Amino acid sequence: MVRSVWKGPFVEGSLLKKADAARASGRHDVIKIWSRRSTILPQFVGLTFGVYNGQKHVPVAVNEEMVGHKFGEFSPTRTFHGHAGDKKAKK
């Protein structure tokens, strides 16, 4: 389901503070975040976030096409190893 328009996008408060501090300092360090549910805002464009996927922080460089999406969409939590092959065909 889509969030209702009158509520506006959800962004973690600490995430806004970290992004503002990074913009003010002008440094291009990776900002570590755990909030996969936060929406990417236009003010995040050009910053790099380390989005936690349960094991490590996956670096996500935000560009204009990502605005409006969630951080979790760009940090997969599961690894696909492929379907099991046919055992009879190998012999």
UniProtKB/Swiss-Prot annotation:
Keywords of the record: Ribonucleoprotein, Ribosomal protein, RNA-binding, rRNA-binding
Keyword Translocase: no
InterPro entries associated with the record: Ribosomal_uS19, Ribosomal_uS19_bac-type, Ribosomal_uS19_CS, Ribosomal_uS19_SF
Gene Ontology molecular function terms on file: rRNA binding; structural constituent of ribosome
Highest taxon, organism lineage: Bacteria
Single GO biological process annotation from the record: translation
Gene Ontology CC terms: cytoplasm; small ribosomal subunit
Physiological role: Protein S19 forms a complex with S13 that binds strongly to the 16S ribosomal RNA.
Family: Belongs to the universal ribosomal protein uS19 family.
Descriptive protein name: Small ribosomal subunit protein uS19
Lineage: Bacteria, Pseudomonadati, Pseudomonadota, Alphaproteobacteria, Hyphomicrobiales
